[in-house]
């Protein structure tokens, strides 16, 4: 089998992250990629001699870094809640924002009103922008549906976007993100729904690798959280 090599040259800096507590920046070097994997970082002349038929990519003085890994995102959503940012920055607690009609429930109402196709088209440019800015792996949580049909809608949109874009996407089912308004006074009943309906449904279509829960005073308590996580484990998450 013939190996395919590419040498990246004219790099101002290469960030190797060799050490756990520092970036490990190197200058005056080139990088060779062999069959899709970084094979060596060295002087350009040394790499060129070792790989005389390699393709060349002129980085034009750019910086080469590892791809960013962006965990805990809700990158498939409807409208922005940027109006809440000023409130949070000024010290208004999240629970107060939620009481005023903002927070997670605002996103839930928005996502429930949108179709799967709309979520895909709305979020494709957002994920493309993340990729342009250096993110190569992203975890995307659901949690803006809070009922089985809408959690599935979110996760199906995630799957379609993952298939369309050169991003590594890890999907997480977060149906236990908040108690929806219709279950506000029947919290254990909502936990039953998540464990007995939503998690099995997502697992049946292999829509999520992970299962998560928002354990926080005023939201899911320890016992409820344990139930959700154990149900996820039982279904391979």
Regions found by a protein language model. Give the residues of each.
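N-terminal metal-binding scaffold of metallo-dependent hydrolase/deaminase domains
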Residues: 1-50
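Short, flexible active-site-proximal loops enriched in glycine and acidic residues
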Residues: 96-99, 131-132, 168-170
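Short loop/turn motifs at secondary-structure junctions
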Residues: 3, 7, 52, 131-134, ...
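Gly/lys/ser-thr-rich phosphate-binding loops in alpha/beta enzymes
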Residues: 29, 35-50, 54-68, 121, ...
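Metal-associated gating/positioning segment near the N- to mid-region
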Residues: 56-122
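Conserved beta-strand scaffold positions in the cores of enzyme catalytic domains, especially
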Residues: 7, 54-58, 171
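Metal-coordinating catalytic core of metallo-dependent amide/deamination hydrolases
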Residues: 107-122, 128, 136-237
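Divalent metal-coordination and catalytic microenvironments
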Residues: 11, 31, 36, 61, ...
């Amino acid at each position: 089998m013939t190996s395919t090599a590419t040498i990246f040259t004219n790099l101002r800096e290469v960030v190797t992250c060799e050490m756990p507590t520092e970036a490990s920046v190197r200058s005056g070097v080139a990088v060779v990629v062999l069959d899709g994997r970084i094979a060596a970082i060295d002087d350009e002349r040394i790499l060129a001699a070792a790989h005389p038929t390699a393709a060349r990519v002129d980085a034009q003085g750019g910086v080469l870094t590892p791809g960013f890994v962006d965990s805990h995102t809700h990158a498939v959503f409807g409208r922005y809640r940027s109006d809440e940012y000023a409130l949070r920055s000024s010290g208004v607690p999240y629970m107060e924002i939620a009481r005023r009609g903002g927070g997670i429930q605002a996103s839930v109402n928005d996502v429930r009103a949108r179709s799967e196709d709309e979520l895909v088209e709305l979020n494709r440019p957002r994920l493309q922008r993340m990729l342009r800015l250096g993110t190569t792996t992203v975890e995307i949580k659901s949690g803006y549906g809070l009922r089985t049909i809408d959690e599935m809608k979110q996760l199906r949109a995630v799957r379609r976007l993952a298939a369309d874009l050169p991003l590594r996407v890890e999907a997480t089912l977060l149906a236990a993100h908040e108690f929806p308004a219709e279950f506000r006074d029947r919290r254990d009943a909502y936990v039953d729904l998540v464990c007995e309906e939503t998690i099995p449904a997502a697992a049946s279509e292999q829509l999520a690798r992970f299962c998560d829960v928002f354990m926080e005073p005023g939201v899911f308590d320890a016992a409820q959280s344990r139930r959700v996580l154990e149900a996820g484990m039982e279904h391979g998450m």
